[in-house]
Amino acid sequence: MITDSQIFFALCIALTAAVLAIGLGRQLYV
């Protein structure tokens, strides 16, 4: 079973990964 806490944890990881990807992308383009 998947609990709400596991879903929240997964969303936090996905959000962090997205922010890091955008940050790295901007550094590469500059």
Swiss-Prot record:
Record carries keyword Transmembrane: yes
What membrane topology does this protein have?
Answer: Single-pass membrane protein
Location in the cell reads: Plastid, Chloroplast thylakoid membrane
Q: What is its main location?
A: plastid
List UniProt keywords, sorted A-Z. Answer: Chloroplast, Membrane, Photosynthesis, Photosystem I, Plastid, Thylakoid, Transmembrane, Transmembrane helix
**InterPro entries xrefs:** PSI_PsaM, PSI_PsaM_sf
- Single GO cellular component term: chloroplast thylakoid membrane
Q: Which domain of life is it from?
A: Eukaryota
Q: What are the recorded Gene Ontology BP terms? A: photosynthesis
The residues that cross the membrane are 5-25
Q: Is tRNA-binding a UniProt keyword of this protein? A: no
Task: Tell me the Pfam families matching this sequence.
Answer: PsaM
Note the NCBIfam families from the entry: PS_I_psaM
Entry similarity comment = Belongs to the PsaM family.
Q: What is the name listed in the Swiss-Prot or TrEMBL entry for this protein?
A: Photosystem I reaction center subunit XII
Origin species: Emiliania huxleyi (Coccolithophore)
Gene name, Swiss-Prot/TrEMBL:
psaM
